[in-house]
């Protein structure tokens, strides 16, 4: 693009597949051009074992929504589809990547940050698979200052965690669902008045935890109900 003096937005997304537990990798393949430069990429395993990747994408003319790629066994692209439809027009990277999980029924769940109707928010939704992805059950997560949400699943459980500044302290909060994302109960996990990292929801066997590092309290692990 530079050689041809053509306009170019974002960066390329590449993936490489390992079939021996990470000891070696097949040659990398490009998934797509025009990803948002600084938002993290998330990955998950689809119901049939195929790798999935989700990232913030720059759609024409300048909408920074999200894309979802599904790979073939050799690491080449099977499909790349638009995954969210909030149509946020911004000429810059918001530094908020999504999170994606697939539950035991094969349902894809995602959380992401976007601006919709003029306000920046964290959202949750189920990404219905098919010839074109549709978002089901989209709902706001947290309040107007919610940020950097993450999620994980265990049998019969779906958990979302995020941090949110209340004007004085940064709160760590969570949502739990036992019905596949149809309804949620909110829980307060912790708070800090210092700097903090992005929380991560992790799974060990059938138990879910939230892992959070803060400047004053250090590393902490919170078991979820």
Show which residues each predicted segment covers.
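Extracellular, repeat-based ectodomains that mediate carbohydrate processing or recognition
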Residues: 1-225
């Amino acid at each position: 693009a530079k050689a041809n003096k053509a306009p170019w937005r974002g960066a390329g997304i590449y993936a490489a597949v390992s079939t021996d537990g990470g000891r070696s990798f097949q040659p990398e393949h490009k998934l797509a051009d025009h990803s948002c430069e600084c938002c993290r990429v998330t990955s998950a395993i689809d119901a049939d074992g195929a790798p999935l990747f989700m990232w913030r994408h720059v759609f024409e003319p300048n909408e920074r929504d999200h894309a979802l790629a599904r790979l073939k066994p050799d690491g080449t692209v099977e499909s790349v589809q638009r995954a969210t439809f909030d149509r946020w027009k911004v000429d810059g990277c918001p530094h908020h990547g999504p999170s994606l999980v697939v539950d035991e029924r094969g349902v894809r769940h995602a959380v992401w940050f976007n601006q919709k109707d003029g306000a920046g928010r964290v959202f949750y939704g189920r990404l219905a698979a098919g010839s074109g992805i549709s978002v089901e059950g989209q709902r706001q997560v947290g309040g107007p200052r919610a940020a950097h949400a993450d999620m994980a699943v265990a049998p019969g459980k779906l958990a979302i965690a995020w941090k949110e500044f209340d004007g004085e302290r940064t709160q760590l909060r969570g949502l739990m669902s036992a019905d596949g994302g149809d309804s949620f109960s909110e829980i307060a996990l912790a708070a800090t008045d210092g700097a903090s990292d992005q929380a991560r929801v992790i799974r060990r066997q059938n138990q879910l935890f939230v892992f959070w590092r803060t400047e004053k309290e250090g590393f902490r692990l919170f078991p979820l109900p």
